[in-house]
Amino acid sequence: MLPHLVLNSISWMLLSCLLFVFQVQGEDFQKEVPSPRTSCPMGYKAYRSHCYALVMTPKSWFQADLVCQKRPSGHLVSILSGGEASFVSSLVNGRVDNYQDIWIGLHDPTMGQQPNGGGWEWSNSDVLNYLNWDGDPSSTVNRGHCGSLTASSGFLKWGDYYCDGTLPFVCKFKQ
């Protein structure tokens, strides 16, 4: 039998070797994993894991969403954070001088039947957690049931607009 002291030394040496091997293999694995970068087609801009494009040809809200759906997982843009709102605003500002609104993927399929504007949703089914209304969407002033970005807010805030109106729009899709 090996003395207790020798057995402890061998155990520590074996453990140290195993830890070294796992650490080296882990470093090699990390080097092989490419950093996530979104490469978008010409005319589109990347933000996080999506591609975005401002389409200047005015369409109704429904026609605009159909145009966006021609791309993989494409829809009118859903804006899920303040950072994304700023990105979309920078994409639009200075390029739509003749329009007071542009389409985004918000719509109210209940046509205002839900109290307090509770029927609004994104066309791509993203969860509507981030809210950035330029006023009250349930007011009786406009009563549109499709969402837009408003020029008066620097294209940062949302308004409601008549779905049959024709406006430029922003598409968002995964590449």
Curated annotation (Swiss-Prot):
Induction (record text): IL17A induces its expression in primary keratinocytes and skin wounds.
Q: List the disulfide bonds.
A: 40-51, 68-171, 146-163
PTM info: Proteolytic processing by trypsin removes an inhibitory N-terminal propeptide and is essential for peptidoglycan binding and antibacterial activity.
**Where does this protein reside within or beyond the cell?**
Secreted
- For whether the record's keyword set contains Ribosomal protein, the answer is no
Tissue specificity comment:
Small intestine and pancreas.
| Annotated region (Sufficient to activate EXTL3), positions in chain | 103-118
Q: Where is the C-type lectin domain?
A: 47-172
The residues the entry assigns to the signal sequence are 1-26
A single GO BP term for this record reads: positive regulation of wound healing
Q: Which residues form the propeptide?
A: 27-37
Keyword check for Glycoprotein, yes or no.
no
Which Pfam families does the UniProt entry name for this protein? Lectin_C (PF00059)
InterPro entries according to UniProt? C-type_lectin-like (IPR001304), C-type_lectin-like/link_sf (IPR016186), C-type_lectin/snaclec_domain (IPR050111), C-type_lectin_CS (IPR018378), CTDL_fold (IPR016187)
Residues involved in Zn(2+) binding: 50, 107, 121, 145
User: GO cellular component annotations, sorted alphabetically?
Assistant: extracellular region
Instruction: State the associated disorder.
Output: Overexpressed during the acute phase of pancreatitis.
Q: What is known of its domains?
A: Lacks the EPN motif and the presence of Gln instead of Glu at amino-acid position 114 may explain its inability to bind peptidoglycan.
Its function, per the record, reads: Bactericidal C-type lectin. The lack of the EPN motif may explain its inability to bind peptidoglycan.
- Name the chain's protein: Regenerating islet-derived protein 3-alpha
Give the organism, scientific name: Mus musculus
